[in-house]
Amino acid sequence: MTTLKASLTEAMQIMLDTVSWKEPEGITTGFPHFDQLVRGLRPGSLTVLASRPSLGKTAFALNIVRNLMERKPETPLLYCSSLSSTELTFRLLTIFSGVTCSFDHDLSADESVRLTETVEAIRDYPLSIVDSRIMDDRFFRELILLQGKNSFGLILADSVMPEHLPRLKQLAGELEVPIFALISVSQRDGYIPGSEWVDTVIHLHRDRRETKNEGRAPVSIVVSRNRFGLCGTCRLNFIPQTMRFEDVPDIEDNEDEQEETR
C-alpha cells in the first residue's frame, strides 16, 4: 500500500517532466514524427502495433531494427514465430541494401555489389534472433537468461497472440526493457483482447491500391492509446519493393490533431 503523501513527489515530477518535455525519452525508433508522438520506448513498457495481415507490420519492425543497428545505441532482440531467422535476415538484407526483394527480379551487377557490401557492413552488428514457434513458460525463461547474458535494449516480438500480452508486460517490467509487439487484427480498428495490459496501442493502415511516385505507398500510423505521450496520426511512406519505411518530408502531413493522454 502507498499513501497519497508518498506518491505526490513522484507524481509531481512526472507532471513537470511532461510539461517541460522536448526530446523523446527512452529508445527512439529512427522515425522522428513517430518518436515525437510516442515519446520514445521506455524501459518496462509494452507497445503493440496492430494491423490487418500483410500490410507491413513486420517490415516496420525490421526498419526499427535497421535504424537501431545503424546508430548502435542499443542491442535489439527480434522474436518471430511465423518466420525463420534466415527469412528475417533476408528481409533485413533487402532493407539495408535497397535491392528489390522480388523473386522474379534479376540482379544487376551494381545490385550484386551492393548486396555483398551490405553483408560485410552488417555482419558484426549486435542483433539476436529467436524464431521459436511456441511462446510458453520455457520460452520466457530462456528470454530472461538471454537478457542476463546480453543486456538487450529492446525486444521486438512479431506474430504475438493477444493472450500473451499480460506475460509480455510482466516480462518488460522484470527485465526493465521496452517490448514492441506486433499483432494481426481482422478489422481496420480491430479490438485487441488483453489491451488493458498495453501502455501504447498503435494501428497501421495502408491501402494496397494506393501508391505515389517511385512506388511509395502512404501509410498512417495511428497512436490510439499512449500512457507516456500523445495520441494522433503519423504519416510515413512505405516502399514495398525494398520493404523500407521513410518519414514524409513535409511536416504538415503529420499535423493531424494530437491530444495529451490523460
Question: Which residues fall in each region the model found?
Answer:
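The Walker A/P-loop phosphate-binding site
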Residues: 2-99, 194-195, 261-262
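Cytosolic-facing regulatory segments adjacent to core modules
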Residues: 36, 72-151, 234
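Hydrophobic/aromatic beta-strand patches that form the interior of the parallel beta-sheet core
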Residues: 47-49, 77-79, 130, 180, ...
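A short beta-strand-to-loop transition that corresponds to the Sensor-1 phosphate-sensing loop
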Residues: 80-83, 181-187, 207, 227
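Conserved Walker B catalytic segment
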Residues: 162-170
